[in-house]
């Protein structure tokens, strides 16, 4: 099992939670980004720098993740692709995507893209709240416990 992070867009506070979790769970944590990242020294934490470009980091995560891995991303198309490979997906707000929910998310994303393309300003997501951080940490722990039961 490996935790993969779409690190270019992942909030720093979520990365901090992941650093502590990787140590506690003794699991590989790989942060994939198109820029250099500073991470704490750890035998469990590493970065994977990819070339700059549209979806380069996403494509690398899809290529390398396996069933049973966890992917941290807010990118809906990336989430859909790794779900097809049998990986679990958690967004930085603590929402776990599933085969049942990802289709609805893809539809909503496409609708919002259409609105933006027609000139409608849709705004971005709200800032990450303390409640979001707690929810993320709780869902991460829940995934870990479920993974341990499956062994």
From Swiss-Prot:
Transmembrane segments: none annotated. It comes from the Bacteria. It holds the Pfam family DUF188. CDD domains: PIN_YqxD-like. Belongs to the UPF0178 family. PANTHER family: UPF0178 PROTEIN YAII (PTHR35146:SF1). This is UPF0178 protein YaiI.
């Amino acid at each position: 099992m490996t935790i993969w992070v779409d690190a270019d867009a992942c909030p720093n506070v979520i990365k901090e939670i992941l650093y502590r979790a990787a140590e506690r769970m003794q699991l590989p944590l790989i942060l994939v980004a198109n820029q250099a990242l500073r991470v704490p020294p750890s035998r469990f934490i590493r970065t994977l720098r990819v070339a700059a470009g549209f979806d380069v980091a996403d494509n690398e995560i899809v290529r390398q993740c396996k069933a049973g891995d966890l992917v941290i991303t807010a990118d809906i198309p990336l989430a859909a692709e790794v779900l097809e490979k049998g990986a679990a997906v958690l967004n930085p707000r603590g929402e776990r995507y599933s085969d049942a929910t990802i289709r609805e998310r893809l539809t909503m994303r496409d609708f919002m893209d259409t609105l933006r393309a027609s000139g409608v300003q849709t705004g971005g997501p709200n800032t990450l709240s303390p409640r979001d951080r707690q929810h993320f940490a709780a869902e991460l722990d829940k995934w870990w416990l479920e993974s341990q039961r499956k062994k």
